[in-house]
Amino acid sequence: MPLNDFHVSEPYTLGIELEMQVINPPGYDLSQDSSTLIDAVKPQLTAGEIKHDITESMLEMATGVCRDIDQVAAQLSAMQHVILQAASEHHLGICGGGTHPFQKWQRQEVCDNERYQRTLENFGYLIQQATVFGQHVHVGCANGDDAIYLLHGLSHFVPHFIALSAASPYMQGSDTRFACARLNIFSAFPDNGPMPWVSNWQEFAGLFRRLSYTAMIDSIKDLHWDIRPSPDFGTVEVRVMDTPLTLDQAINMAGLIQATAHWLLTERPFKPQEQDYLLYKFNRFQACRYGLEGMLTDVYTGDRRRLADDTLRLLDNVTPSARKVGADSAIDALRLQVKKGGNEAQYMREFIADGGSLIGLVQKHCEIWAGQ
């Protein structure tokens, strides 16, 4: 299938997707009934979209095109209210977090959707194991070449985005010792990690054509890179963040990515080259394993520095851009988070260390999402 032309969109506009957990109290395992909830919610929506994701325990909230994080907040808040009301009526819970801490992948039912069923046929049990929950942020671009530059620029900060949003320390009833275990689930997929190197949109079109020869790629949606261009939307989509426990954190991460995109496209601080990616997976691993305490290695100098310190440097660099796009409150909140030295994975471990159970942890996450 040929690649569609890159749709022109207003630069720096946002679109947010949140993959939410549908929970079945009182045991607080994942429910297998998201279809009922989605059917109940759809007629009540005034903005955005609620839809299926891979399995019946997942629900995706997606905003429309938003100018700034205030519009993102308004749309997500409205959807959250409608979903929580419907969930209560159906005796279900909703929560964030990148993984459910004790669900068993063998129990997960793939949605009755042609695309997901085809994916199940291609990837087998890997699709059931991919019952994990992420936040995706789309940023508008004026053209395909800008999108490729932006993708390469944002790739420098994949570890920072992972470390700030890490919220998946528990899987299958065990502490994984990772801050973000969710991304490990995708390591067996052939398109895991960074996009193969291209320098412009024309080269990307050639890459896509070659990938389509595998008969596993029908559209850009079948590629699960950490960051990917989305020509139909005219965006670059960042896909490495865990779904947070609160809307505030989701909005803050969106604001950071918007501000970083503005800084990258206006200042052009990097000249992308293929060597930039030589240590990409090592630095990504550090962020997944240790969060903000991970160590970044500079691919050119060999210098090593704490992710927390480099994240503060990133926040300082993008602060002027954040003011221009209306995301300065997000940068301030994330700066405070880094200085306090934590992320949501750390909070989860503290809950368990204080005597809480994994069931109690999911219950607490539902209460947090409901604002209780």
Swiss-Prot record:
The keyword ATP-binding belongs to this UniProt entry's keyword annotation: yes
InterPro entries noted in UniProt: GCL_type2/YbdK_subfam, GCS2, Gln_synth/guanido_kin_cat_dom, YbdK
Gene Ontology BP annotations: modified amino acid biosynthetic process
Entry keywords, A to Z: ATP-binding, Ligase, Nucleotide-binding
Pfam families xrefs: GCS2 (PF04107)
Catalytic activity: L-cysteine + L-glutamate + ATP = gamma-L-glutamyl-L-cysteine + ADP + phosphate + H(+)
EC number annotated for this UniProt entry: 6.3.2.2
Signal peptide: none
Top-rank taxon: Bacteria
Protein's job: ATP-dependent carboxylate-amine ligase which exhibits weak glutamate--cysteine ligase activity.
Oligomer and partners: Homodimer.
Family of the protein in this entry: Belongs to the glutamate--cysteine ligase type 2 family. YbdK subfamily.
Name used for this protein in its record: Putative glutamate--cysteine ligase 2
Source organism of the structure: Salmonella arizonae (strain ATCC BAA-731 / CDC346-86 / RSK2980)
